[in-house]
């Protein structure tokens, strides 16, 4: 399976640096990295151009696309280039050391296309490091999406809710039998406390600071229990 990553980058170089450091520590193999950078920060673009641990295709947008369209266009470029799976990530979401191992396990799971996608973030983490289960929840804090899922679920529904693409996918889950695959213990964590689009620092702290996520360097033996 040909695998790509799709990262969006805006104007917070300090967060982007943390995200890329965490990504490198997952030891991703056989991924090509697609980046959609908004044309607003020379420091962010410099960081993107300096990436040397994965093959990287950088697109500097001709105008600011925003939090809905930049992820869509970046993922679309990866699928249009022929990749079978795209791992989506934003510039203020850090990863657990075994996050790439989880994505690889998802790629090998023979029933993966029965689900909307793999959601690496779990706001209700309960501590089991190995279990991956079916959930009706959805968030955009790192996803893995196959070509089949992209064509069947994301393309027809991504722009259906004006509030945002996460609301579009939440609505799809609510009105259908579909579920997500998600780890019992979150494999991503939101660090975008300041300078973002959606949250004030106090809102961010309330929603994210105390949510458990896997931080030790052990690699789990993932067990899919949908």
Task: Describe these PLM feature segments.
Residues 1-89, 93-226:
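Peripheral/terminal regions associated with large enzymatic or DNA-binding modules
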């Amino acid at each position: 399976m040909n695998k790509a990553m799709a990262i969006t980058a805006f104007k917070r170089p300090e967060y982007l640096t943390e995200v890329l450091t965490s990504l490198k520590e997952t030891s991703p193999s056989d991924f090509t990295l697609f980046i959609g950078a908004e044309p607003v920060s020379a420091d962010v673009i410099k960081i993107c151009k300096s990436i040397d641990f994965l093959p990287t295709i950088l697109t500097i947008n001709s105008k600011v696309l925003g939090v809905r369209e930049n992820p869509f266009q970046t993922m679309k470029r990866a699928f249009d280039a022929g990749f079978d799976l795209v791992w989506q990530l934003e510039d203020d979401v850090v990863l657990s050391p075994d996050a790439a191992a989880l994505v690889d396990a998802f790629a090998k799971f023979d029933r993966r296309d029965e689900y909307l996608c793999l959601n690496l973030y779990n706001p209700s983490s309960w501590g089991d490091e190995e279990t991956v289960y079916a959930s009706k929840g959805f968030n955009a804090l790192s996803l893995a999406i196959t070509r089949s899922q992209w064509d069947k679920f994301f393309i027809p529904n991504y722009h259906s809710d004006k509030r945002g693409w996460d609301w579009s996918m939440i609505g799809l889950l609510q009105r259908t039998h579909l579920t997500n695959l998600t780890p019992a213990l979150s494999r991503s964590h939101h660090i975008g406390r300041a300078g973002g689009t959606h949250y004030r620092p106090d809102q961010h702290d309330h929603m994210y600071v105390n949510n458990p996520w896997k931080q030790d360097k052990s690699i789990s033996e993932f067990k899919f229990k949908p």
